[in-house]
């Protein structure tokens, strides 16, 4: 017998029982995005490798260790996208969407990173991202955060996420801070682990979010990034904080929050949770005013975020068990007896015409009434429509409320109206 071929480690199948809750969560997210006037953009999952090297930064874990990169048959270096912002910016430049324009965009889909698979972190994972172009004030930063806060309320998880904020200033301010931080780290080099020693000269700000407890203790005495901010960045951050306070959104300023990608400036933020074991990031983003120009476009202010859907689904399931998937089926059509199947299928098509949006499944494969009602229960149907030989002969159907057990014989022409009343 041939050996079974299994999924690649860290790249998961999502089965019907799981995709149902994903669909409900994604529907909730998309409804909120629509209420803010954001438009979907669909992007390739494969891009030219230099796009990510230029956008993310060559001296980052993503580029150095995690990207899935390969040569195609033409010898071009291609990469499965590890994140969505770079591709969105590339598309905006390529199609003339950005210069002297405002765009509020969102995208959803799989991303790929070669990481050690663990709960909520996989090699193929799914993100929903938002990107706004052409607006440079703190008000749009605040709107994005307010949008995410509305998501948490709609999903019933507001009490389980907290907002952390920081400003990492301008490029010049970060360069000055980088020099001060490197000088401090050099004085305490013996207390750094090997990873931090490597980052100290290549990407020293990444030392700030080291997970090593000893390094975190050392950083208590390090220079503070906030002390090196330029005045414009200070005013921008103060404006953002004031807007969030006016909106009733609580936050904590975390001066060690820097984000893992090189393109950020000024505002950075993360929504974090402790409800999945160790602290985990649910949603993160910030401002990246230099990235469009860095990738070949005209200078354009920009801000955005990305959210990992696997982790969000886990969080919703962990803290809000009342948030359940919608049933697969609203109505199950039961048919038993000689020559009833064609009549049942014809009635089903008529009901689908008259009740758009209602999910109706017709029984196939035969079976007595008991077996068919068991199938209706399995699929979560609220109502059964029953056709037997006598109903076909009389032009009627029996409509049964599967919750109360009440059933009524109804003329087939009136079945849709009766169902509309039952289903609300």
Curated annotation (Swiss-Prot):
Its EC number is 6.1.1.21. It catalyses: tRNA(His) + L-histidine + ATP = L-histidyl-tRNA(His) + AMP + diphosphate + H(+). Its main location: cytoplasm. InterPro entries: aa-tRNA-synth_II, aa-tRNA-synth_II/BPL/LPL, Anticodon-bd, Anticodon-bd_dom_sf, His-tRNA-ligase, HisRS-like_core, HisRS/HisZ, HisRS_anticodon. It is found in: Cytoplasm. Pfam families: HGTP_anticodon, tRNA-synt_His. Keywords: Aminoacyl-tRNA synthetase, ATP-binding, Cytoplasm, Ligase, Nucleotide-binding, Protein biosynthesis. One of its GO terms (cellular component) is cytoplasm. GO terms for molecular function: ATP binding; histidine-tRNA ligase activity. Transmembrane segments: none annotated. SUPFAM superfamilies: Class II aaRS ABD-related (SSF52954), Class II aaRS and biotin synthetases (SSF55681). The keyword Nucleotide-binding applies. GO terms for biological process: histidyl-tRNA aminoacylation. PANTHER family: HISTIDINE--TRNA LIGASE, MITOCHONDRIAL-RELATED, HISTIDYL-TRNA SYNTHETASE. Belongs to the class-II aminoacyl-tRNA synthetase family. Homodimer. NCBIfam families: hisS. HAMAP family: His_tRNA_synth. This is Histidine--tRNA ligase. The lineage of its organism: Bacteria, Pseudomonadati, Pseudomonadota, Gammaproteobacteria, Enterobacterales.
């Amino acid at each position: 017998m041939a050996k079974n071929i299994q999924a690649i480690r860290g790249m998961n199948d999502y089965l019907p029982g799981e995709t149902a809750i994903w669909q409900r969560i994604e529907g909730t997210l998309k409804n909120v995005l629509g209420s803010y006037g954001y438009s979907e953009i669909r992007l390739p999952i494969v891009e030219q490798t230099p796009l990510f090297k230029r956008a993310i930064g060559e001296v980052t874990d993503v580029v150095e260790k995690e990207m899935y990169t390969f040569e195609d048959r033409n010898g071009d270096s291609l990469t499965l996208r590890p994140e969505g912002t770079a591709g969105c910016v590339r598309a905006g430049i390529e199609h003339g969407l950005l210069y002297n324009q405002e765009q509020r965009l969102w995208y959803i889909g799989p991303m790929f990173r070669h990481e050690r698979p663990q709960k909520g972190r996989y090699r193929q994972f799914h993100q929903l991202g938002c990107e706004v172009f052409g607006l440079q004030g703190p008000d749009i930063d605040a709107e994005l955060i307010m949008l995410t806060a509305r998501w948490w309320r709609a999903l019933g998880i507001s009490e389980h996420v907290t907002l952390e904020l920081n400003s990492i200033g301008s490029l010049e301010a970060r360069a000055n801070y980088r020099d001060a931080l490197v000088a401090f780290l050099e004085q305490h080099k013996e207390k750094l682990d090997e990873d931090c020693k490597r980052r100290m000269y290549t990407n020293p700000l990444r030392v700030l979010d080291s997970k090593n407890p000893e390094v975190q203790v050392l950083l208590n005495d390090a220079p503070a990034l906030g002390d090196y901010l330029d005045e414009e960045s200070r005013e921008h951050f103060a404006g953002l904080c004031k807007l969030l306070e006016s909106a009733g959104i609580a936050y904590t300023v975390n001066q060690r929050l820097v984000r893992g990608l090189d393109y950020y400036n000024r505002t950075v933020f993360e929504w974090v949770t402790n409800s999945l074991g160790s602290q985990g990031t649910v949603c993160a983003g910030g401002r990246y005013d230099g990235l469009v120009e860095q990738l070949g476009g005209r200078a354009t202010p920009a801000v955005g975020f990305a959210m990992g859907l696997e982790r969000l689904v886990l969080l919703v399931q962990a803290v809000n068990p009342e948030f359940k998937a919608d049933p697969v089926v609203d109505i199950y059509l039961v048919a038993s007896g000689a020559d009833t199947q064609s009549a049942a299928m014809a009635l089903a098509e008529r009901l689908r015409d008259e009740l758009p949006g209602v999910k109706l499944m017709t029984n196939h494969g035969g079976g007595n009434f008991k077996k068919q009602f068991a199938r209706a229960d399995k699929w979560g149907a609220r109502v059964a429509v029953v056709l037997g030989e006598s109903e076909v002969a009389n032009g009627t159907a029996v409509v049964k409320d599967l919750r109360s057990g009440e059933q009524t014989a109804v003329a087939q022409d009136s079945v849709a109206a009766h169902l509309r009343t039952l289903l609300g």
